[in-house]
């Protein structure tokens, strides 16, 4: 029982220390969030979506020299959203802008954003926006 209690106490301290680092390193975390936003902008401004596909949490964490788990926890603490949700929101924002601004077809927009299949883009868009890309374009 004594060993179990000490292990439990140790793990509790580890958990508290892990959570505390997000509070004490607030300015550093804001910098990482800015770098993440810059990484997303650079990624979608380049030809990487067409060559690599959609960015993953692991890719972003690797580019920022962080572990995927730590990166995910950091983004969740700073934004209230998971890193995956953050990436998906970025894709939706870009898709909405391209649908309204560009005179590209939905297929071209899908490939430009890194989707392998336009059907996946349409399904993804409808899940997040509530309308298909064409419906969204026609309503705005």
Predicted regions and their residues:
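C-terminal regulatory or interaction extensions
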Residues: 9, 16-34
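Amphipathic alpha-helical segments enriched in hydrophobic/aromatic residues interleaved with Lys/Arg
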Residues: 1-14
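…primarily DNA-binding HTH/wHTH and HhH modules…
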Residues: 123-140
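A short, Lys/Arg-enriched amphipathic alpha-helix from helix-turn-helix/homeodomain DNA-binding modules
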Residues: 4, 26-66, 85-104
